[in-house]
Amino acid sequence: AHQLPMGTLCNFYEWYRRDD
């Protein structure tokens, strides 16, 4: 289950990369 972290776009990008 993908859950986007409540933060800025930077955080989103970091989460996306870590998702890998």
Swiss-Prot record:
Signal peptide extent: none
Catalytic activity as recorded in UniProt: Endohydrolysis of (1->4)-alpha-D-glucosidic linkages in polysaccharides containing three or more (1->4)-alpha-linked D-glucose units
Keywords on record: Carbohydrate metabolism, Glycosidase, Hydrolase
Keyword check for Hydrolase: yes
Enzyme kind, highest EC tier: hydrolase
Activity at various pH: Optimum pH is 4.5. Stable from pH 4.0-7.5, activity decreases drastically above pH 7.5 and below pH 3.5.
Temperature dependence: Optimum temperature is 70 degrees Celsius. Active from 30 to 75 degrees Celsius, inactivated following 150 minutes incubation at 85 degrees Celsius.
GO-annotated molecular function: alpha-amylase activity
Keyword Hydrolase part of the UniProt annotation: yes
Regulation: Strongly inhibited by Hg (2+). Inhibited by Zn (2+). Activated by Fe (2+), Mg (2+) and Ba (2+).
EC number: 3.2.1.1
Task of the protein: Alpha-amylase active towards amylose, starch, amylopectin and maltodextrins. Has lower activity towards glycogen, and is not active towards alpha/beta-cyclodextrin.
Protein name: Alpha-amylase
